[in-house]
UniProtKB/Swiss-Prot annotation:
Its cofactor is Fe(2+); Ni(2+). Keywords: Amino-acid biosynthesis, Dioxygenase, Iron, Metal-binding, Methionine biosynthesis, Nickel, Oxidoreductase. It comes from Erwinia tasmaniensis (strain DSM 17950 / CFBP 7177 / CIP 109463 / NCPPB 4357 / Et1/99). Its EC number is 1.13.11.54, 1.13.11.53. Catalyzes 2 different reactions between oxygen and the acireductone 1,2-dihydroxy-3-keto-5-methylthiopentene (DHK-MTPene) depending upon the metal bound in the active site. Fe-containing acireductone dioxygenase (Fe-ARD) produces formate and 2-keto-4-methylthiobutyrate (KMTB), the alpha-ketoacid precursor of methionine in the methionine recycle pathway. Ni-containing acireductone dioxygenase (Ni-ARD) produces methylthiopropionate, carbon monoxide and formate, and does not lie on the methionine recycle pathway. Pfam families: ARD. The record marks 96 as: May play a role in metal incorporation in vivo. This is Acireductone dioxygenase.
């Protein structure tokens, strides 16, 4: 189940706030400019849907977001435990970084942990099926897909070139809980 855990940036073992309630999560994250919402497909996706089927099932929600925010492109990414690059990709995503654009992800299946470094706190957002998160441009963050990743997500971009990271060099991510 989706969850938000908040730590101070100086204490990585004891949370100062925790909730699994989507409305509470959306309110707490929204106060920091982070969008969190739940989407539903407009059809059954079946087993192992292709990217076109995934996009089609959520096109209504994508169109609403594009109309509101002016995003330019979207795609589907899937990661599985048998991916030969999983360790290198996990390591890269675990380094704190920022983007010059919003990082928008919608989880079609599976899970991932977004960790946001905001105002002296670390907001760990466990995103699961039907969760959308939009991390504002310039927000220091990292992402953990776990040691045996399993997720499919829709990525939505401001920039036609897609995901461009600027790594901060801050090792803070090393001290916080990760997915198994």
């Amino acid at each position: 189940m989706s969850a938000l855990t908040i730590f101070t940036e100086s204490e990585a073992t004891t949370p100062v706030w925790y909730s699994m309630d989507a409305a509470e999560m959306a309110e707490k994250l929204g106060s920091k400019g982070v969008r969190f919402e739940r989407w539903q497909a407009d059809r059954d996706l079946g087993d192992n849907p292709d990217p076109e089927t995934v996009i089609g099932a959520y096109q209504h929600a994508i169109d609403r977001l594009v109309a509101e925010k002016g995003y330019q492109s979207w795609d589907v990414i899937s990661m599985r435990a048998d991916n030969p690059q999983k360790e290198a990709l996990r390591s890269k995503f675990l380094s704190e970084h920022t983007h010059g654009e919003d990082e928008v992800r919608f989880f079609v299946e599976g899970a991932g942990l977004f960790c946001l470094h905001l105002d002296g706190h670390i907001f760990q957002v466990l995103c699961e099926k039907n969760d959308l998160i939009s991390v504002p441009a310039g927000t220091p963050h990292w992402f953990d897909m776990g040691s045996s990743p399993h997720f499919t997500a829709i990525r939505i971009f401001d920039n036609q070139e897609g995901w461009i990271a600027k790594f901060t060099g801050d090792p803070i991510a090393d001290g916080y809980p990760r997915l198994p």
